[in-house]
């Protein structure tokens, strides 16, 4: 065991000046881990490398004595989304690995749709920042230093939008983002995926995806073979894919939602027969991964774990650190849902638990905003308690990451506007649509609490400014959040003020708003610059072009808005037709004091226009 390498690498994340000279590190066969500080240094006894790394964190924290029994979860993993535009650099993944090690994780899943190189398939991941074989081997080797197993998390059925951008894959395209099942060409592609993973990773576990394939068999498959029950197609494909996995020594994990959706589409009296079909036809050794990022009632987790146990004896759980609703996370909701989910997992003896960090629609939110939830999962796993005090979370996260827990939690406040107090509406990120909604169209204006929204974002900007000063290791994250809040301070209610001034024929007010467009453009450019710096520090360059296009479009529309207002004021046009349209709520719902509740709207294309884009 090369302790010098382990301690030298971990010191990159630990407080400056930490030294492990005089510490005795001993691997034993007993369950759990133990630390005792002495005058000479101290003693750490551990069974597994992740336990050692966690204890080294306690040593750096200044702990006098720590005793932890065996982790409550056999596999505690973090899933890193490497497929939604932002592909983390090898250096970023290594930093993540060090932080996971100090927390006590023993597995890392890399979510790779098409962002890895497949020999013989040049368009697979083309211009998407795909990893080379050398990069993935380097990540795998580095994680092994700390006893962290890197597990490939690929897609073998749906979520393959990237490859269908290219005509090279037309022949195996069923519909939407779904592969054509029962095709020799599809089987050849999947074999290439699995054999490649076998050559790159030490792990003999592989996650084969297969989630959210609702349109399976409804496109080219139906044209070739006629209509067929979706579950039957899925089970046949699953057996074919897992047979290939076994050839390469892999045991498979898969998302379970397609089976659960099939059951819930039927009357409950028909469930037992379909449960038996699934249990009998899911290949032995295949783990069903029950994912749930939403529920705020423990009973839902209890009920769903029991349902999954009727489908398979091998069930794991995946929760979420919500970073996929825009630039700001939803950490209060994530913490609430995580507490309930993990309590249920502990009660029901779920052995494997995963924390996901998806990056839907552009991967706009910074990876490190997930650190509080990451830390929470680790503390629950290693203590068996779900009530972790803020003092413990603060101390542990400070030593494992160098970042203040309270400051990172505060990044969520950009989504917790006056009509959406924490923990907020599930999955709603108003900061994104307040930023991107068109100033002349006001698609979301009825959902803005104009009385307090601007002041809220000014307070957020001040808070993020202080956080940037207090967190030297991740200043850029807080600077970016500050600059976003400064844009939103002016823009969140801009469309409301513009419509009011136009309806009132308030010419001085309209002129002032035309001038304000320039200020919003300047603030947006500062936000864009800090976001780019944040991106360049962590991700490959591929995918940044999307942010340039979106933010550039926003600034262009602000210039157009100023021009349109002035054209109206100087008499070039008699009306501004966009402002004469009645503002409707984005969704039909009940208003309170004239303000409609916020809505879930995460897709940029739906936010910026009512047109096709």
Describe the role of every protein-language-model region:
Residues 25-26, 35, 66-70, 84, ...:
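Generic preference for hydrophobic/aromatic residues in regular secondary structure cores
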Residues 41-246, 253, 316-319, 324, ...:
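Feature activates predominantly on carbohydrate-active enzymes
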């Amino acid at each position: 065991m090369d302790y010098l390498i382990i301690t030298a690498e971990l010191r990159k994340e630990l407080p400056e000046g930490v030294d492990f000279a005089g510490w005795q590190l001993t691997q034993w066969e007993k369950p759990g881990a133990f630390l005792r500080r002495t005058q000479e240094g101290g003693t750490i006894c551990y069974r597994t490398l992740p336990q050692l790394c966690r204890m080294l964190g306690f040593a750096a924290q200044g702990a006098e004595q720590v005793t932890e029994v065996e982790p409550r979860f056999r596999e505690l993993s973090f899933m890193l989304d490497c497929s939604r535009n932002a592909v983390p650099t090898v250096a970023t993944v290594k930093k993540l690995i060090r932080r996971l090690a100090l927390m006590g994780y023993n597995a890392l899943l890399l979510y790779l749709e098409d962002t890895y190189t497949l020999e013989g398939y040049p368009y697979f991941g083309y211009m998407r920042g795909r990893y080379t074989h050398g990069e993935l081997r380097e990540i795998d080797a580095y994680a092994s230093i700390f006893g962290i197993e890197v597990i490939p998390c690929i897609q073998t059925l749906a979520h393959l939008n990237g490859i269908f951008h290219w005509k090279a894959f037309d022949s195996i395209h069923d519909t939407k983002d779904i592969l054509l099942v029962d095709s020799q060409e599809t089987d050849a592609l999947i074999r290439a995926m699995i054999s490649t993973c076998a050559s790159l990773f030490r792990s003999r576990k592989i996650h084969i995806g297969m989630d959210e394939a609702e349109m399976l068999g409804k496109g080219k498959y139906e044209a070739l073979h006629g209509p067929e029950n979706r579950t039957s197609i899925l089970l046949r494909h699953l057996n074919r894919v897992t047979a290939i996995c076994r050839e390469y020594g892999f045991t498979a994990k898969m998302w379970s939602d397609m089976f659960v959706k099939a059951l819930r589409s039927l009357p409950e009296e028909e469930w037992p027969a379909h449960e038996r079909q699934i249990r009998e036809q899911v290949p032995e050794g295949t783990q069903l991964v029950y994912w749930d990022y939403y529920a705020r009632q423990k009973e839902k987790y209890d009920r769903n774990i029991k349902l999954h146990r009727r489908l398979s004896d091998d069930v794991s759980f995946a929760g979420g650190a919500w970073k996929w609703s825009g630039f700001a996370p939803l950490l209060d909701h994530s913490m609430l849902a995580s507490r309930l989910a993990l309590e249920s997992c502990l009660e029901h003896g779920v052995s494997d638990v995963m924390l996901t960090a998806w990056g839907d629609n552009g991967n706009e939110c910074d990876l490190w905003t997930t650190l509080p939830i990451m830390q929470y999962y680790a503390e629950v796993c290693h203590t068996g308690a779900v009530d972790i005090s803020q003092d413990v979370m603060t101390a542990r996260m400070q030593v494992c990451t160098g970042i203040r827990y309270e400051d990172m939690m505060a990044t969520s406040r950009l989504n917790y506007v006056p009509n959406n107090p924490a923990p907020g509406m599930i999955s709603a990120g108003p900061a994104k649509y307040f930023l991107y909604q068109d100033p002349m169209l006001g698609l979301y204006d009825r959902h803005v609490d104009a009385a307090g929204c601007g002041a809220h974002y000014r307070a957020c900007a001040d808070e993020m400014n202080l956080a940037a000063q207090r967190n030297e290791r991740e200043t850029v994250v807080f600077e970016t959040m500050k600059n976003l809040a400064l844009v939103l301070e002016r823009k969140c209610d801009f469309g409301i003020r513009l419509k009011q001034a136009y309806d009132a024929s308030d010419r001085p007010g309209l002129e002032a708003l035309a001038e304000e467009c320039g200020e919003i453009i300047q603030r947006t450019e500062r936000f864009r610059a800090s976001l780019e710096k944040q991106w360049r520090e962590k991700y490959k360059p591929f995918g940044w072009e999307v942010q340039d296009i979106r933010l550039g479009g926003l600034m262009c529309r602000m210039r157009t808005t100023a021009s349109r207002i002035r054209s109206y004021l100087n008499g070039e046009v008699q009306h501004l037709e966009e402002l004469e349209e009645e503002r409707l709520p984005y969704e039909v719902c009940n208003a309170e004091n004239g303000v409609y509740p916020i809505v879930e709207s995460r897709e940029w294309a739906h936010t910026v226009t009512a047109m096709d884009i």
